[in-house]
Amino acid sequence: MKLTCVVIIAVLLLTACQLITADDSRGVQKHRSLRSTTKVSKSTSCMEAGSYCGSTTRICCGYCAYFGKKCIDYPSN
């Protein structure tokens, strides 16, 4: 009986600790995909429109047209 009570109290304490730490970290961590794009944009420079793009070259500022293998700017709205 005592062991059961000790186990129940331990589980409740561990659950409470997890809830407290999860609440404290809210807003600190960014979404995984946003972090990776900001790291890439800070660490590499992009290729201008008209430059050759392929699997071994740097990233285009816009996007890479795979059929023509040239960097193209995003269309403006």
From Swiss-Prot:
Q: List the disulfide bonds.
A: 46-61, 53-64, 60-71
| One Pfam entry name | Conotoxin
The molecular function terms in GO held by this entry are: calcium channel regulator activity; ion channel inhibitor activity; toxin activity
Name of the protein: Omega-conotoxin-like 6
- Where does the protein end up? Secreted
Alphabetically sorted, this entry's keywords are: Calcium channel impairing toxin, Disulfide bond, Ion channel impairing toxin, Knottin, Neurotoxin, Presynaptic neurotoxin, Secreted, Signal, Toxin, Voltage-gated calcium channel impairing toxin
Q: Per the record, what about its domains?
A: The presence of a 'disulfide through disulfide knot' structurally defines this protein as a knottin.
Its family remark reads: Belongs to the conotoxin O1 superfamily.
Indicate whether Flavoprotein appears among the record's keywords.
no
